[in-house]
Regions:
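Conserved phosphate-binding elements of NTP-dependent enzyme cores
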Residues: 1-949
């Protein structure tokens, strides 16, 4: 019997209070509520977790060991579950080889397309490449000097896993003696079995010949090699290695391309990857700003930071460099900036002729050398690659920075792969197009009837995947964009596009705020995509705060009423209309307009000082000039991909950080930033975790734990026992429980089952030993305090002003419900960001601090957004400047100044459409933001305004 509802009984996961609920199936369901109310606990930790657990229980014990933890959620019963797929925001890969193209698998289809219908062109002569005849190959060999030792090889295996035992036995029977395996020539008889799990390259040594005028032996050997390897032969000399192909080679210069296969176009395979950067597109090179941070100093004064401590010493390395300095007459007392550029280049990059010099060892041995002397830069780069010492690697690495690969110029592929064209573009040029441009290119692609027949299915698949990405508002992304640079919302929408393409039915999808990072203009597309998935016969459970998405849903579950211990209940459940009419629902109050975030009565004009970015050209920015008034709340808006992050993060933030001394941070491209003297500190408040380990928590991050430990150390009991504040730290020996080393939990390995975490049996999860827990303050131990919520701690420490002030800031940012000792790893991105905000609120304002936030409303309910705006306004009231990238209209309407980017995403963006107050933006007809802002400001006028300044 097909059940029409998912029925949940007795859910108690995290803060859920034994709730029971019926959710209609095959509908678009929104779960909402204030931050910390329990909506994620219900959607992901209960419903999805149980669906996943039931699937995993159907697998064998052997398979389960590879799939992580499948612990049963704390719930009595769930009926009506479908197979569950979670599409969350924690899926962005940090792998530098992962791109939008590889994640969506479009690049895999592209590789197949280029391998099947691509035409190779000579990169130097721009003519189509055809196969070499044996005569042409021999003509090339005859150009070599007489008596050159030549080896003819036949590449029979290229990067394939396996022992290749059958092939090796066959070669031995046919009389071959030597092979080159993975670059090393070996005798077949002495060959040890190959590792079956590794990729191997095997070239058969066909013949070894000393070059003379006899062409016949070369002809026979090349013919044999070509036959063995299906058209390929390698000429190996002491000086070089040349690939011959009877399939593809330039008639003029002999440039050869191997047989076109998909792996040739993979930057993750040795045959396709650029040999210099190994397919990364970047290499680590010495950054002169790190090597010479102050060019007003001379070499003798330590101007070259690498040599600051060894100038004029007996160090052998310095003796070599000093010989180079002496030979080229480089003055060690002249400021580096005044040295002739040619002489400085010799010092940095090495001599252009051999130099005679002496080395004096500490033992007194003198050795005479006559050789090229390596410059500082190549020497640092070489030592970084060669050293096995972690400390040395860090030291050499401190002078290096990522730079575009000089060989492939960021394309990641080798010359042969980049020579193959389809529609006049190589595969790298194809991936540089935006999704929108790629769709147009594929629609206009002209092919011969034969090519069209071969590529029909591949092109159809590529077009489908591109259109799905376009459908969810990602038309501005390029396929070569690194996955690690995607926002949580972008990564989630890519996964959403993949699921739309799969066209599965009868599935339960659980999504986490898919509207994040999406401009209001693109939201309708996303809602349409969600409805399409629902109409296929799927159930969509979406954790969401966006009002438009809620109004478009079939059913809303409002979890609350408050956060933490004050939440965990179902406040209301029903259609959007029923929620709006429910007096108990705070969500309904905002949806119906009973509650709202008011428009400020006045807009600040700033303190008279400004920051000005001149001619910014990073990524898609088109030489834009932007002025930010200091002492204001400024919001940067625009459709997705319009250039907001490029301007705010890469150009302005990184530029200021670099100017303020953080030299390893590379500023984005712009002519200059004016007004830097008006800023003494820049604070980026992102949604990255406040710590990577369970030891990090809100109390330690905000510094309030130091004050609490001081307080415990001053108690009569602590003084009697001789305990100082260090005794009350769970990170060091002394006061902590040594059985769990202050973690409070123990990990038990279960081999074929997931690891189990249990409370430490020595301390009972309290982190401290018995002696430390004998000390009490107002009847509570240090472990009891860590277990308090911010709200409870505020009341407990109400008489201790220093502690109360820090706790109050946590309370003010809406985190009254989190525990002081709550593990950083359990905090959401929005919660982590607000902990950081609270930490900054504690500090004394300088009036010269710039706060930068990227979409701070992520994960926030309208009621939380109201609190966030109040906190941001407080920072500005203290005299500092707040700069925010945001799509949330409630935040935008409260700004003093808006910088609207656009008009479109990708190459269609990168310009400033309009700047000014929200009222000015609302009147700008070219601004998409203004079109959505205008009705809100008109509503604000109808309801009156609040004084936020």
């Amino acid at each position: 019997m097909n059940q029409k509802y998912i029925t949940i009984q007795g859910a108690r996961e995290n803060n859920l209070k034994n709730i029971s609920l019926k959710i209609p199936k095959d509908k678009l369901i929104i779960m909402t509520g204030v931050s910390g109310s329990g909506k994620t606990s219900l959607a992901f930790d209960t419903i999805y977790a149980e669906g996943q657990r039931r699937y995993m229980e159907s697998l064998s014990a052997y398979a389960r060991q590879f799939l992580g933890n499948s612990e049963k959620p704390d719930v009595d019963q769930i009926d009506g579950l479908s197979p569950a797929i979670a599409i969350d925001q924690k899926t962005t890969s940090n792998n530098p080889r992962s791109t939008v193209g590889t994640v969506t698998e479009i690049y895999d289809y592209l590789r197949l397309l280029y391998a099947r219908i691509g035409v190779p062109y000579c990169p130097d002569h721009h003519i189509p490449i055809t196969g070499n005849s044996i005569k042409e190959m021999i003509d090339k060999i005859m150009e070599l000097p007489d008596k050159t030792r030549c080896t003819i090889l036949s590449p029979v295996i290229q990067g394939k896993k396996g022992t290749h035992k059958d092939l090796i036995e066959k070669l031995m029977k046919e009389g071959y003696i030597r092979v080159r395996i993975d670059g090393e020539i070996k005798y077949l008889e002495e060959l040890e079995p190959l590792d079956k799990n590794k990729k191997h390259t095997i070239d058969v040594v066909v013949d070894r010949i000393v070059k003379n005028d006899d062409r016949s032996r070369f002809h026979d050997s090349l013919e044999t090699a070509l036959k063995l390897s299906d058209g390929l032969a390698i000429l190996l000399t002491n000086e070089s290695e040349t690939l011959f192909s009877s399939n593809y080679a330039c008639k003029i210069c002999g440039f050869s391309v191997p047989k076109l296969e998909p792996k040739l176009f993979s930057f993750n395979a040795p045959f396709g990857a650029c040999p210099e950067c190994k397919g990364l597109g970047i290499t680590q090179k010495v950054d002169l700003s790190l090597l010479i941070p102050d060019d007003t100093k001379s070499i003798a004064q330590g101007g070259i930071h690498y040599y600051k401590n060894i100038v004029n010493t007996e160090n052998l390395e310095w003796q070599r460099i000093h010989a180079l300095i002496k030979y080229y007459e480089i003055d060690m007392d002249t400021p580096i900036k005044d040295l002739p550029k040619k002489k400085l280049n010799y010092l940095l990059y090495g001599s252009d002729v051999p130099i005679a010099y002496q080395l004096n060892s500490r033992s007194g041995t003198v050795s005479t050398k006559f050789e090229y002397i390596e410059g500082v830069c190549p020497m640092i780069e070489r030592r970084y690659m060669e050293t096995t010492s972690t400390m040395s690697r860090e030291w050499y690495g401190s002078f290096l920075a990522d730079a575009q690969c000089p060989k492939c110029h960021g394309a990641r592929l080798n010359k042969q792969a980049l020579s193959v064209l389809v529609g006049g573009k190589n595969i790298y040029e194809w991936t540089q197009m935006s999704i929108q441009e790629a769709i147009q290119f594929m629609n206009e692609l002209e092919l011969t009837p034969t090519q069209a027949k071969i590529a029909e299915l591949v092109i159809k698949e590529i077009k489908n995947r591109l259109s799905f990405l376009n459908h969810v508002g990602l038309s501005y992304l390029t396929l070569d964009r690194l996955a690690s640079t995607l926002s949580g919302g972008e990564a989630q929408r890519i996964r959403l596009a993949t699921q739309i393409g799969s066209r599965l039915t009868g599935v339960m999808y659980v999504l986490d705020e898919p509207s994040i990072g999406l401009h209001q203009r693109d939201n309708d597309r996303l809602i349409g995509a969600l409805k399409d998935m629902r109409d296929l016969g799927n159930t969509l459970i979406v954790v969401e705060h966006d009002e438009d998405t809620m109004r478009a849903s079939d059913y809303i579950v409002d979890v609350g009423p408050g956060a933490g211990v004050h939440g965990g209940q179902i406040v209301a459940a029903g259609t959007p209309e029923e929620i709006m009419q429910n007096e108990n629902s705070i969500t309904g109050a905002y949806l119906s307009g009973r509650k709202r975030i008011e428009v400020p009565m006045t807009r600040r004009k700033g303190n008279g000082k400004k920051l000005k970015v001149v001619r910014a050209s990073q990524n898609n920015l088109k030489n834009v000039n932007v002025t930010i008034k200091l002492g204001t709340f400024t919001v940067v808006t625009g459709v997705s991909g319009s250039g907001k992050s490029s301007l705010v993060t890469e150009v302005l933030t990184h530029g200021l950080q670099h100017a303020l001394g953080r030299l390893r941070i590379k500023p984005g491209a712009c002519k200059e930033i004016q007004g830097i003297e008006n800023i003494d500190k820049i604070v980026e408040i992102g949604q990255d975790p406040i710590g990577r380990t369970p030891r990090s928590n809100p109390a330690t991050y905000t510094g309030v734990f130091d004050d609490i430990r001081d307080l415990f150390a001053q108690t009569k009991e602590a003084k009697m026992l001789g305990y100082d504040k260090g005794r009350f730290s769970f990170n060091v020996k002394g006061g902590r429980c040594e059985a769990c080393q202050g973690d409070g939990i123990l990990r038990i390995s279960m081999h074929f089952l997931p690891d189990v975490y249990v409370p430490c049996d020595q301390c009972g999860g309290k982190r401290y030993n018995e002696e430390t827990l004998q000390v009490h303050y107002k009847g509570k131990t240090i472990a009891d305090v860590l277990d308090m919520t911010v709200e409870e701690a505020l009341e407990f420490f109400s008489n201790v002003s220093k502690i109360k002030h820090k706790l109050q800031t946590l309370n003010d940012v809406g985190l009254s419900y989190i525990k002081l000792g709550q593990s950083a790893t359990t905090l959401s991105g929005g919660e982590a960001q607000r902990v950081k905000l609270a930490s900054e609120l504690q500090k004394k304002a300088t009036g010269k601090t710039l706060f930068v936030l990227d979409e701070p409303t992520t994960g926030l309910h309208s009621d939380d957004v109201k609190k966030l705006i109040e906190v941001l306004q407080r920072l500005v009231e203290h005299g500092d400047t707040v700069l925010v990238i945001e799509h949330n209209l409630d935040v935008i309407k409260c700004a003093d100044q808006i910088i609207d980017m656009g008009p479109e995403g990708g190459q269609g963006g990168g310009t400033v459409i309009c700047t000014g107050t929200p009222e000015k933006i609302a009147e700008c007809k070219e601004s998409y933001t203004g079109q959505y802002l205008k009705p809100l400001l008109e509503k604000g006028e109808d309801h009156g305004k609040s004084n936020c300044s």
